[in-house]
Amino acid sequence: MSNINVIDILKESDALLEGHFLLSSGRHSNRYCQCAKLLQCPQKAEKVISVIAEKLKEVDFNIIVGPAMGGVIVSYELARQTNKPGIFAERKEGVMCIRRGFEIKKGDKVIISEDVVTTGKSSLEVAKVIEEMGGEVVGIACIVDRRAEDIKTNYPIYSACKLEIETYEKDNCELCKKNIPFVKPGSREQK
């Protein structure tokens, strides 16, 4: 496999943005990663996800589950590259579930696929559903791991890249102090 610079591909795809952002957590940042911009470019997405597929070669799993929305395309492409089934979980009445005829069988070894892992919240919601159905989560695969050091998951993370993006409380945000307007790029509804 050739040496793939994931950060460069994210920048070329306008997926790694710089500016002033209000994150779904309510914190502010000067950088934001919007992997949907990468995923609209199939050839670039294929290259980046090949980095994850390479890391999964030694992992024993038989199915991939991506939470909607961000994990759906990642699940598909990772499934294509690893020759494993790829399905997705979605919310119904606010609760994550497996539907549309998809199933997790007792004993299935599952990789959860995501675009970006920040807090791990959606991955952990999906893991709960998988485990309730009798599956075993053996890892989380993602394009970007941007967890802070204090954010832990119970599962190994297989990422194409690790990004450390600083975040700030509104009161400590230098960009706010400079009156630079923010944008809300997140995928979760602001509360």
UniProtKB/Swiss-Prot annotation:
It holds the Pfam family Pribosyltran. The keyword rRNA-binding does not apply. It is an enzyme of class 2 (transferase). Gene3D superfamilies: 3.40.50.2020. Its cofactor is Mg(2+). The keyword Cell inner membrane does not apply. It catalyses: orotidine 5'-phosphate + diphosphate = orotate + 5-phospho-alpha-D-ribose 1-diphosphate. Its EC number is 2.4.2.10. GO terms for molecular function: magnesium ion binding; orotate phosphoribosyltransferase activity. GO terms for biological process: 'de novo' UMP biosynthetic process; pyrimidine nucleobase biosynthetic process; UMP biosynthetic process. Homodimer. This is Orotate phosphoribosyltransferase.
